A protein has these predicted regions:
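Phosphate-coordination/substrate-recognition cap region in phosphate-metabolizing enzymes
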Residues: 30-118
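Short N-terminal binding/cap micro-motifs at the start of the first secondary-structure element
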Residues: 12-17
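Internal catalytic-core helix/loop-beta-alpha segment
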Residues: 113-167
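Active-site metal-binding loops of divalent metal-dependent hydrolases
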Residues: 9, 186
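Extreme N-terminal starter segment of soluble prokaryotic enzymes
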Residues: 1-4
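Short catalytic helix/loop segments, enriched in acidic residues and glycine
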Residues: 18-34
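Acidic, low-complexity terminal tails and accessory targeting/binding regions
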Residues: 73-91, 149-179, 191-230
Length: 230
């Protein structure tokens, strides 16, 4: 399976739409996406994500599943250093890195900062739960920190086959894997990646950056039994 996560183009947050530059980004993005063999599209219900997706969907004559759980985080927390209310990923490095819970992919929501607003944990868990439900419709069942592919013919490939290993090359997928494209937001994309890669949310959100109209591609590694890991 291939998962492609697209952040909305440059936003006009006041109108919940796109700036003039954002519309140009969305058009250029559509030229790239329209060349893909996409199984299904998903999109946040917020205007800036829907507007970004609209160019691609029109060009491909497709529709997207609008999913409320893909809406951006609306909850905020009080930054203990600045005293300001901020998104639950805008922290001072020397502050959040001093809390061991921030390095736990499950317990980070119990950290002193994040637990100050229980909605942060609830939103994160909602995204993770709904992501797993969507993957399950394609046969990918969460099993602790990996996925198991329902009905998949088991095979065991120790290393990536080289071109001079034809008998092993034949065992690789033939390219007909499902391809899912999701139009969403920074916090949502960070949450999905945190869950799939088993990386603490705050750590990932500070270590990686997903600019407007960015494209993040995950491909499931499926070479050992019925196991899959993104």
């Amino acid at each position: 399976m291939r998962l492609i996560l697209i952040r909305h183009a440059e936003p006009d947050y006041v109108r919940d739409s796109l700036t003039e530059k954002g519309w140009r980004e969305a058009e250029l993005l559509s030229e790239r996406v329209s060349g893909w063999d996409v199984t299904e599209f998903f999109c946040s219900p917020l205007g800036r994500a829907k507007d970004t997706a609209s160019k691609t969907l029109k060009k491909m004559n497709r529709t997207a599943v609008t999913a409320d759980w893909l809406s951006e985080f609306s909850c905020q927390v009080k930054n203990p250093v600045t005293g300001q209310m901020t998104s639950p990923w805008e922290y001072i490095p020397s502050d959040w890195t001093s809390d061991p819970l921030m390095y736990d992919s499950e317990a980070w929501t119990n950290s002193e900062i994040c637990s100050s607003n229980p909605e942060v944990g609830r939103k994160y868990r909602l995204i993770c739960r709904e992501m797993d439900r969507m993957l399950e419709t394609y046969g990918y069942i969460r099993d602790k920190n990996i996925y198991r592919v329902r009905g998949k013919k088991e095979q065991y490939i120790i290393h990536t086959p080289a071109p001079d290993e034809p008998e092993k090359m034949e065992m690789l997928p033939e390219g007909n894997e499902p391809c899912i494209v999701i139009f969403a937001h920074f916090g949502v994309i960070s949450s999905i990646l945190s869950h799939l890669l088993n990386i603490p949310f705050v750590l990932l959100a500070h270590a990686a950056f997903f600019p407007a109209s960015s494209v993040t591609v995950l491909s499931a590694e499926e070479r050992w039994g019925n196991e899959a890991y993104f």
